[in-house]
From Swiss-Prot:
Keywords: Activator, DNA-binding, Plasmid, Transcription, Transcription regulation. The lineage of its organism: Bacteria, Pseudomonadati, Pseudomonadota, Gammaproteobacteria, Enterobacterales. Homodimer. Signal peptide: none annotated. Gene3D superfamilies: Homeodomain-like. GO terms for molecular function: DNA-binding transcription factor activity; sequence-specific DNA binding. Disruption phenotype: No longer transcribes cfaB; in a strain that also has an H-NS (hns) deletion cfaB is still transcribed. This is HTH-type transcriptional activator CfaD. Residues 164-261 form the HTH araC/xylS-type domain. The keyword Protein transport does not apply. Induction: Transcribed at 37 but not 20 degrees Celsius.
Amino acid sequence: MDFKYTEEKEMIKINNIMIHKYTVLYTSNCIMDIYSEEEKITCFSNRLVFLERGVNISVRIQKKILSERPYVAFRLNGDILRHLKNALMIIYGMSKVDTNDCRGMSRKIMTTEVNKTLLDELKNINSHDDSAFISSLIYLISKIENNEKIIESIYISSVSFFSDKVRNVIEKDLSRKWTLGIIADAFNVSEITIRKRLESENTNFNQILMQLRMSKAALLLLENSYQISQISNMIGISSASYFIRVFNKHYGVTPKQFFTYFKGG
């Protein structure tokens, strides 16, 4: 079911969002259409959305209150994700999940109602207290009916691939002028070997580099601490005007439009 779209200023459409970290998103102030693999999920306000790592999505977001941010996002780093996965495997008596199984969008992106009290506890935990965060997230998941798909998705998101190793190398210094040759040297193999291994995972060097640069740029914009020219240099693009064009082509919005919408005002 489609929701009613109102004024254009209340709405934004963003394309090509790569989920690099397993993400739990709470639609505190928006209604969101999520598009992936030619499917669409409509998520109404005050819902939880579980986004599997590695999923590429486009979203259309409509705010309820213009002066507030549209959602709250919890992005799980690798260590938190692994600890969460290990705990869930023990609690629910699961040994492993078939990572080669053909899985549709409904098993990679899941939405559910949320207990507001549990969510508030999660938001109020100190950002450096990983153990408390993991415990609260486990408890929240335990209160969700039919949570098997969520646990399966967390397990699969914790699996590391060769492309992840390439990302980790690049992420250490995004400002560097990366080439396939530099990556090959880092792994002490040929460029052809790098190319073939990435192709076996349905990706390539240029795609990984662009996704990392654009994802980092989006996060830096949300921090509201840097000028466009600074962000451009931080992600390895020397020209600010070129960065704006690339950002617009990738996401379908300019950096200014992106920042203005998500800053909450």
